[in-house]
């Protein structure tokens, strides 16, 4: 089970969310642009 989900820092770095998710996050974290 743990293999599928990123457990170590390296795994998290390698794993990158989809561009749409990144865009959504940027908009959410930077409301005033």
Swiss-Prot record:
GO terms for biological process: neuropeptide signaling pathway; pheromone biosynthetic process. One of its GO terms (cellular component) is extracellular region. One of its GO terms (molecular function) is neuropeptide hormone activity. Residues 13-26 have a biased composition (Basic and acidic residues). Residues 1-33 are annotated as: Disordered. Disulfide bonds: none annotated. It comes from the Eukaryota. The modification Leucine amide is found at residue 33. Keywords: Amidation, Hormone, Neuropeptide, Secreted. It is found in: Secreted. Involved in the control of pheromone production in females. Belongs to the pyrokinin family. This is Pheromone biosynthesis-activating neuropeptide.
């Amino acid at each position: 089970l743990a293999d599928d989900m990123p457990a170590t820092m390296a795994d998290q770095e390698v794993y990158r969310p989809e561009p749409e998710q990144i865009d959504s996050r940027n908009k959410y974290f930077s409301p005033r642009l």
